[in-house]
């Protein structure tokens, strides 16, 4: 989420969110502004999620799933160490296949 969007974001209702982010992303730095963790927390709070599952897909990739939100909404966050602004795929070592993850997420809603 860009700094402009962050400063002007005023959602009218809860919205499911999927965030895939490389720690070493220099195009959209994880530290922001705003910090990606802050953005994810904002959406998790807005969606009134009550459960957080934290899973290491592989040692370098942590997946956080904020579940049981309003209207069944969820917030998913895949944080990939040693990864920049690239598309995670089966050919790399991230443990995340972006296309499949996106389909899995959005097919729920």
Each PLM stretch: what is its role?
Residues 1-109:
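Flexible, surface-exposed loop/gating regions in the mature catalytic domains
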């Amino acid at each position: 989420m860009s700094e402009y969007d962050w400063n002007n974001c005023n959602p009218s209702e809860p919205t499911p969110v999927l965030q895939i982010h490389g720690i070493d992303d220099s195009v959209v730095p994880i530290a922001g502004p705003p910090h990606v963790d802050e953005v994810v927390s904002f959406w998790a709070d807005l969606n009134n999620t009550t459960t957080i599952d934290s899973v290491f897909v592989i040692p370098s990739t942590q997946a956080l799933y904020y579940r049981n939100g309003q209207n069944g909404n969820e917030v998913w966050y895949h944080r990939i160490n040693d990864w920049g602004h690239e598309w995670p795929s089966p050919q790399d070592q991230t443990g995340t296949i972006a296309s499949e993850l996106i389909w899995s997420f959005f097919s729920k809603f």
